[in-house]
Amino acid sequence: TSQPDAFPVDAWVDAEPIPTAWGSLSLVLATRRLFEKAWQDGCTSMLLLSGDMLPLQSFQVIERSCRQTQMSLQPCTGLNDRQRRANDQRYSTIAPWFGLAKAALRKQNMFFAMSSADYALLRDLDPSDFPLKKLADEYFWVNGLISRGRFVSPRRFVYCNFDPTCTQAASFNLDEALLEHCCQGGYIFVRK
């Protein structure tokens, strides 16, 4: 909304927010607008989170970790046939746009941290003509960085599913055992 009831002092409220929908290209466009504002404000890194994510580390650890780009990536192995076919179709669609071979492409979780230096590499990419209209948020950022020669290694940024090949959040009980598993695994956030 362009007129929230309450917001922190010195917060920026977009007067004309981009309407977004789950899995839509609009999420990439809205994220880019947020990142551009952060860039203009001199931020050294940007962190994209969701309201259903909980921190697993102290603020100091989160702040230090998020100074560099952090993405949870889908592994290349262990995918089921449906996942392989879906990625193959999407990679075929976006590979020419990025100028990359299909084998170089990756899928990410939509929530991530990005350094301003890495974002600078992507500022000339115009997501409005990105050929993937559905689930663009899981393919645009990571592959944009790869297309700019940036190696993106998988990080344990957000825990969202017992199955490491799935990038969407699963329903689970947030109990002590799960929290301990996430913390020991080095995750920064858990998404429920």
Language model: regions and residue ranges:
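ER/Golgi luminal nucleotide-sugar-dependent glycosyltransferases, focusing on the catalytic module
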Residues: T1-K192
